[in-house]
């Protein structure tokens, strides 16, 4: 029986005030940018947080719509509207990715052009208080955030970079290119930023990001580094995980207070809903061992390899008939993985792996 190739598209959640809009960018041939909006009830105006997404490997039109629910829920509780734009060439946004290549500084600036278009749209929204804004970015989105901070809208009071950068593995001295990009940005930036990088970041370990950070500061940039040590099997996914909140939220909240942005919880209904509990680790097989998974054919094993590349909270489910499905991030990836699998498995699916542990046992049916 054929399985489901990964996670299904997630519909907007009305209980989070979530909607999807398409915003034109400002290029010679404009493209529509798929943009997720989370808003509290009421007319506003609300302070605004913009979150810039990372870059998956492969075809970026297949990249899921970014939501970053751990962060979105924290800001919603405090009365913010949250805007998460997919840049050109990503997910359902039109066109091809711009600024790709070893010119990492130019790549970040090309991505920042997309964000300038989104901010211009935000300025026209009656629900947005553009005097009180913050911007966060993860991975490629962190690079985008630092590039944007060179010429920001004056309403942005805080910029936060989570594991920001861009990495290439062939035909590129990307470590030097990243250092040069950060030096360039630091020389042109007059607003402070807060940076989070983990010890076991598979993309940007301390040996890479340390010199890049020093280049940024030496060039004149004002940045505070939070080196938070190891996180799970890969610190690069920290921001996407609810477990990561313990590392970054308090520090960001302190910075919000310093710049007179709101931090009091005014909408507690946006707190995270209870999620399905994970089964205990079974030790059935190492989670990375694709060949040990029972029941799956080639498509399912290929899907499992994709699953293994996803950071943060994740789950993979299988069924005796060959059905499979996975999910990562969001409020309840365990339940979503089972739901995805059971669209074909008809109730026979069981969890095989959760996060970095195998939970399947030989007694599972």
Stretches found by the model and what they are:
Residues 56-67, 74, 84-110, 237:
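Cap/lid segment of the alpha/beta-hydrolase catalytic domain
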Residues 103-125:
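Alpha/beta-hydrolase active-site loop
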Residues 219-278:
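C-terminal catalytic histidine-bearing segment of alpha/beta-hydrolase fold enzymes
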Residues 9-43:
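N-terminal cap/lid segment of alpha/beta-hydrolase-fold proteins
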Residues 45-54:
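Short beta-strand element of the alpha/beta-hydrolase
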Residues 90, 243, 265-365:
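Secreted/extracellular ectodomain signature
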């Amino acid at each position: 029986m054929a399985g489901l190739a990964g996670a299904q598209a997630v519909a907007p959640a009305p209980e989070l005030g979530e909607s999807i809009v398409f915003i034109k960018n400002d290029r010679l041939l404009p493209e529509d940018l798929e943009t997720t909006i989370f808003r509290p009830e009421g007319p506003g105006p609300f302070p605004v947080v913009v979150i810039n997404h990372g870059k998956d490997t492969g075809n970026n039109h297949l990249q899921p719509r970014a939501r970053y629910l751990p962060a979105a829920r924290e800001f919603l509780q405090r009365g913010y509207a949250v805007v998460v734009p997919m840049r050109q060439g990503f997910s359902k946004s039109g066109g091809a990715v711009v600024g790709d290549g070893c010119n990492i500084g130019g790549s970040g600036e090309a991505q920042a052009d997309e964000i300038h278009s989104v901010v211009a749209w935000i300025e026209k929204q009656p629900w947005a208080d553009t005097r009180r804004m913050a911007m966060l970015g993860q991975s490629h989105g962190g690079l985008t955030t630092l590039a944007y901070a060179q010429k920001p809208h004056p309403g942005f009071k805080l910029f936060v970079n989570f594991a920001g950068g861009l990495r290439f593995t062939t035909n590129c001295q990307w470590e030097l290119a990243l250092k040069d990009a950060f030096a360039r940005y630091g020389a042109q930036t007059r607003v402070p930023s807060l940076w989070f990088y983990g010890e076991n970041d598979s993309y940007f370990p301390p040996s890479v990001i340390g010199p890049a950070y020093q280049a940024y500061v030496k060039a004149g940039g004002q940045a505070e580094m939070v080196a938070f040590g190891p996180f799970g099997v890969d610190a690069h996914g920290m921001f996407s995980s609810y477990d990561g909140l313990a590392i970054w939220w308090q520090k960001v909240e302190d910075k919000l207070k310093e710049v007179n942005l709101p931090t009091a919880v005014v909408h507690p209904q946006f707190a995270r809903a209870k999620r399905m509990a994970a089964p205990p680790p079974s030790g059935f097989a190492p989670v990375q061992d694709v060949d040990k998974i029972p029941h799956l054919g080639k498509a399912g094993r290929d899907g499992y390899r994709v699953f293994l590349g996803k950071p943060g909270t994740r789950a993979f489910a299988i069924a005796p008939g060959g059905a499979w499905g996975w999910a990562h991030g969001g409020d309840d990836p365990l339940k979503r993985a089972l739901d995805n699998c059971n669209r074909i498995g008809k109730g026979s699916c069981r969890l095989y792996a959760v996060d970095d542990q195998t939970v399947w046992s030989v007694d599972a049916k």
